[in-house]
Amino acid sequence: MQKTELDDQKLVEEIARRIREILELLGENPEREGLKETPERVAKALLEMTSGLRTPPPQIKVFNLGDDGEVYEKNQIVLIKDVNFSSLCEHHMLPIIGKIHVAYIVSNSGKVAGFSKIIRIVNYYSSRLQIQERLVEQIADAIMNSEIKPKGVMVIGNAIHMCSYVRGVKDKEAKLVSVAYRGLFKTNRALQNHVFRLLDNANKVNLL
């Protein structure tokens, strides 16, 4: 067994011990049938859902649209829509579940990101205690500061928050939409609206 696996097992054991204590404080019997393995399951789930805190950020795979050194001045917009994500609200540690849409403007160098790498960035920053408003900012910064050096980045988050779904106001319909702008998208309303139109039109097309 590798050292990291040993460390992970110790974490699982320590978290599980505390979950048992919480169950007892709630008036439950952690030794009853149905709950015996719950503390360990919860510990593993929490570690999985916060894995972004303990792993390095993913590196973006770069592809070139043109020949090396060729200037690419077409201002192409790349849109990655409907990236499913889930995170844990840092206020109540309840799930946030929704979709992220990422748009970026290709730089003059013609560098674009590998499709799956954008998804990995979304997963990385959502795998921690989080708020949605910060999540879209972190994703936007990660892409804007990456090797593809885009002219602009726009990240849209749309999600339901279980902290308001199952407790408090218990609203089953409310969703939170948050948007982060970088580069040309920050001041160009026409570009912003263009992305929203792309999303709207894409939702009307059934590709599969």
From Swiss-Prot:
Its EC number is 3.5.4.16. GO terms for molecular function: GTP binding; GTP cyclohydrolase I activity; zinc ion binding. Zn(2+) binds at C89, H92, C163. The keyword rRNA-binding does not apply. Keywords: GTP-binding, Hydrolase, Metal-binding, Nucleotide-binding, One-carbon metabolism, Zinc. It catalyses: GTP + H2O = 7,8-dihydroneopterin 3'-triphosphate + formate + H(+). InterPro entries: GTP-CH-I_C/QueF (IPR043133), GTP-CH-I_N (IPR043134), GTP_CycHdrlase_I (IPR001474), GTP_CycHdrlase_I_CS (IPR018234), GTP_CycHdrlase_I_dom (IPR020602). SUPFAM superfamilies: Tetrahydrobiopterin biosynthesis enzymes-like. PROSITE patterns: GTP_CYCLOHYDROL_1_1 (PS00859), GTP_CYCLOHYDROL_1_2 (PS00860). GO terms for biological process: one-carbon metabolic process; tetrahydrobiopterin biosynthetic process; tetrahydrofolate biosynthetic process. Pathway: Cofactor biosynthesis; 7,8-dihydroneopterin triphosphate biosynthesis; 7,8-dihydroneopterin triphosphate from GTP: step 1/1. Signal peptide: none annotated. Coiled coil: none annotated. Belongs to the GTP cyclohydrolase I family. Toroid-shaped homodecamer, composed of two pentamers of five dimers. This is GTP cyclohydrolase 1.
